[in-house]
C-alpha cells in the first residue's frame, strides 16, 4: 500500500510539472514574457539549455527583465562577455536591480568592456535605487573592495540590444 501511494505521488508530481511547463509554453507562445521565462527555467532544470535560451530570448524580446538577466548570466558563464553585458543592460533598462548590479560589476572589473569605475557608478546608483544593497555599498564607498586603484576613469560603451 505504501509503495503504491508513493508511486502515485511521483506520477502526480511529474504530471503537474509537465502540465505547468505546457501551460507556460502555451502562454509564452501567446506573448506572455513571464511564462516564457518560467518555461526557460523549466528547460534549464531539465538540462535542455538550448530550448531554455530560446525561451529566455523570447521573454527578453517581450521586455521581461528576468529573461534578459538569464541570458546575460548564461552568456557570462559561457565566456561571451561582451554579449552578457548587452543583456544585463537591457535588464537594467527594464528596472531589474540585479541586472544593473551585474552590469556595474562587469564594467568596474573590465569584463567584456574596458574597466571603468566612473562608467560603472550610474549602474550602481540605479541598482541601489532599485533596492540592491551591494549597489548601495559601491555608491557609498566606491573603493570598498580595495582593488579599484587599477581602474581607469574612461567611459565604457555598452551597446544596446
Give names to the regions the model predicted.
Residues 36-45, 68-78, 102-109, 138-144:
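Hydrophobic face of amphipathic alpha-helices that form TPR/SEL1-like repeat modules
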Residues 31-32, 43, 62-65, 94-97, ...:
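Short helix-capping/linker turns of helical repeat alpha-solenoids
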Residues 4-14:
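Sec-dependent N-terminal signal peptides
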Residues 131-161:
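Terminal, low-structured helical/coil segments at or just beyond the last alpha-helical repeat
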Residues 16-20:
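Sec/Tat signal peptide C-region and signal peptidase I cleavage site
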Amino acid at each position: 500500500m505504501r509503495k503504491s501511494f508513493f508511486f502515485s505521488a511521483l506520477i502526480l508530481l511529474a504530471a503537474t510539472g509537465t502540465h505547468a511547463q505546457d501551460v507556460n509554453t502555451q502562454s509564452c507562445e501567446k506573448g506572455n514574457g513571464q511564462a516564457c521565462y518560467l518555461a526557460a527555467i523549466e528547460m534549464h532544470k531539465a538540462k535542455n539549455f538550448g530550448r531554455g535560451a530560446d525561451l529566455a530570448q523570447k521573454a527578453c524580446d517581450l521586455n521581461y527583465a528576468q529573461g534578459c538577466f538569464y541570458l546575460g548570466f548564461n552568456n557570462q558563464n559561457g565566456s561571451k562577455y561582451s554579449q552578457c553585458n548587452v543583456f544585463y543592460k537591457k535588464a537594467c533598462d527594464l528596472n531589474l536591480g540585479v541586472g544593473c548590479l551585474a552590469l556595474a560589476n562587469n564594467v568596474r572589473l573590465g569584463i567584456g568592456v574596458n574597466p571603468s569605475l566612473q562608467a560603472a557608478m550610474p549602474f550602481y546608483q540605479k541598482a541601489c535605487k532599485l533596492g540592491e544593497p551591494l549597489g548601495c555599498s559601491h555608491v557609498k564607498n566606491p573603493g570598498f573592495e580595495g582593488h579599484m586603484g587599477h581602474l581607469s576613469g574612461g567611459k565604457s560603451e555598452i551597446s544596446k540590444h
